[in-house]
Amino acid sequence: AQPPQQADFL
C-alpha cells in the first residue's frame, strides 16, 4: 500500500 502522494510544485 502506498501513501497518498500530495506533491504540488507548479
UniProtKB/Swiss-Prot annotation:
Tree of life domain: Eukaryota
Cellular compartments annotated: Secreted, Cell wall
Record's GO cellular component terms: extracellular region
Keywords of this entry: Cell wall, Secreted
Protein name per UniProt: 52 kDa cell wall protein
Lineage: Eukaryota, Viridiplantae, Streptophyta, Embryophyta, Tracheophyta
